[in-house]
Amino acid sequence: GTSTVTLGLASRDKGTVGVGGTKQDQVADVQFSPQADLNLSMAMGAAKSVVDLGGLRLSSLVVETGASQTEVRFSKRNAMRCTAAEFRAGVAELTVVGLGNSLCDRVSFEGGMGSVVLDYSGAWTADTKLDATLAMGGLTLRIPRAVGVTITTEQFLASFQPAGFTRQGNRYTSSNNATAARHLDISLTTSLGGVTVEWLD
C-alpha cells in the first residue's frame, strides 16, 4: 500500500509557532529509505537547504522555494523512472545538480526574480524534456556536450545567442542534434529574464 507523511511546522488554532533557542542555527536532517517508492513534495521558506535525492526510488518530485538558498542533488542514479519533476522558485537561489541521474521524463521550472542553475550532468538513459518559464531572474542551463538539444522560445529573443546552436525563427538546434544518442527538448518562456547555456565536457 501507499502512505502519506507530512513534515514541517504549521500554526494551530490561529496561533503562532515558535522555535526556542533562536540564537542557535536551526538544523533539520531528514532521511528517506531507498527501498520505498516516493512521490516527494518539498517547500522551503527562508532557509538554506541541501537535498540529495541520489539513489532513491523517486517517481515524481515537486520542489518549491521562497526566499531561500537551495541545492538539490542527484548524486546517484534514480532507482526507478521518474515521470515528472517540478521546480518553482520565487526570490530564491536554486541549484539543481545531476538531472541526468534523475531519470525524469519531463522537468518543469517556473522562476521569479532569483538565480537558478539546472545542471543536466549524470547517466542519461533516455530523452527528456524541459519546460522553463522565467520572469526577471537568471537561468543557467548546464548540458553535457554529447546531448542533442533543441530550444523553442515563445518569442524571438535578440539577447539569446547560445554557442553551438543554429537558429531558425524561434527554434535553436545544437550542431550535434542529428547524431546524438540522447536528446533534451526545451520549451522556453521568458520576459525580462536572462538565459545562459553552458556545455559540460
What are these regions (language model features)?
Residues D37-N39, S60, T179:
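Residue-level detector of solvent-exposed, low-hydrophobicity positions
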Residues L9-V30, Q35-A43, V50-D52:
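A cross-kingdom signal targeting lumenal/periplasmic-facing segments of multi-pass membrane
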Residues G1-Q24, V72-D201:
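Short, surface-exposed interaction patches in beta-rich subdomains
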